[in-house]
Amino acid sequence: EGETLTLEQVLRAIILRSANEASNGVAEYVDGSVEAFAKHMTERAKELGCTNTNFVNANGLFDENHYTTAHDMALIARELLKHEEYRSMMSETDYEIPPTNLQTETRYLHGQHQMLNPNSIYYYKDAIGGKTGYTVEAGNTLVTYAERDGLTLIAVVMKCNGAEHYTDTAALFDYGFANYASVKIAAVSDYTSTVPVTETYNKKAVDLGKVTIAPSEDVYYTLPKGTDASAVTVKTDIPEGVEGTVKKGQTLGTLQLSYNGKTQTVDLIAQNAVDALTDTQKAELDKSSLSGMVKRVAIGVGIAAIVLLLIFCITRFIGYRSYQRRKQLRRQRPRRRRNYRR
């Protein structure tokens, strides 16, 4: 208690040595308590598609309400592979923590995953990372990544005895590499599109520019060997336009790849950022709006003046015509003779 470590050092301790106290420390650092962190983890697992996972602690020690499945764990592992910093950590077999405020000596951490250790009889040359786990109740569990010929596989085994977690994982990898291949479905350019970006200001849509949406890389799908790419159906979900600020790397659409009843989703991300309206731009819009309003008022007043002038002229004209008509009628009437008495 009271020792200061970097988050990077703590994560290495968790990955290489399953350090329970380090896991609890991270939980409290991120969410304030182990309970809140466990709830956070469960929510994140659901976002990744996990349907049978519930966490109640940060270290994985046995609890009836703390559980997962091999499939759910593979989904979590797949997400980790998307982040290069974690891929790097998971592939390490040794790490040194230098002296700290409470420890005067360097601590040497050695990984427990024997499939990553070239000196172990269980070494698997295509394995690139993973994590071990053990409790009396759960037995040996193992999550491992392996890569060969562009194909990355994730193997998860649970409740194993002795060294079964290594031998079973190796058997799964051998089967996967022998029977499956990573097939290119589309290039980035095949699903690159540009859409307008707008922002609502003063109840009007203001054009902010355009954003290019595309996959982050060429799209691949793992298929049984010999299966053509045309066997995969692709459904796109691309917006016609985007409202509001866009950050580079933001997910704005998806590709849904389907084969044999299974679906894989590929994110379409923003290739460029689009900024919101600046205060200067808003001021210009306000000025333009005010100028337009003044013009409309001026035009309205001008039209009203013209209408009034027309009404005045028409009224005078009608009055003049009436006067002329009365005058003409008086001229046309016969004059009466008057008799005068003498």
PLM segments and residue spans:
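Active-site-adjacent loops and short helices of periplasmic peptidoglycan-processing enzymes
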Residues: 1-71, 75-84, 88, 148
